[in-house]
């Protein structure tokens, strides 16, 4: 499946990729791994990661997805401080129903209301 992705997805970090059923991140980590080949600094890593997005329904899968992203980065780079990278990961990879997601504002459209009376 990944063979069908355009090659510039890996080299042009302005290209956005969203996995609507991210699972534990197999596809996202593959794309990230290919992008990391063109990174030389933490800033490059953040740029490569900042246009990757994933939505997954199962919370435990999202936790594993985020760990897999960190592990993918650690296989290629020695990172001492993950704060900036974690900010991107926590913002871009979310637990939600893909069909109830507002992509323009990157937030859930599911409205829950609590009765006031």
Predicted regions located by residue number:
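SAM-dependent methyltransferase catalytic region
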Residues: 2-117
């Amino acid at each position: 499946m990944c063979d069908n992705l355009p090659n510039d997805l890996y080299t042009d970090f302005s290209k956005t990729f969203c996995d609507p059923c991210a699972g534990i991140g197999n596809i996202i980590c593959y794309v990230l791994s290919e992008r990391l080949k063109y990174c030389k600094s933490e800033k490059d890593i953040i740029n490569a990661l900042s246009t990757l997005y994933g939505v997954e329904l199962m919370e435990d899968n999202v936790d594993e997805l985020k760990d897999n992203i960190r592990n993918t980065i650690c296989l290629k780079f020695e990172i001492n401080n993950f704060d900036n990278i974690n900010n991107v990961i926590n913002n871009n990879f979310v637990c939600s129903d893909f069909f109830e997601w507002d992509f323009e504002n990157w937030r859930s459209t599911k409205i829950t209301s609590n009765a006031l009376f």
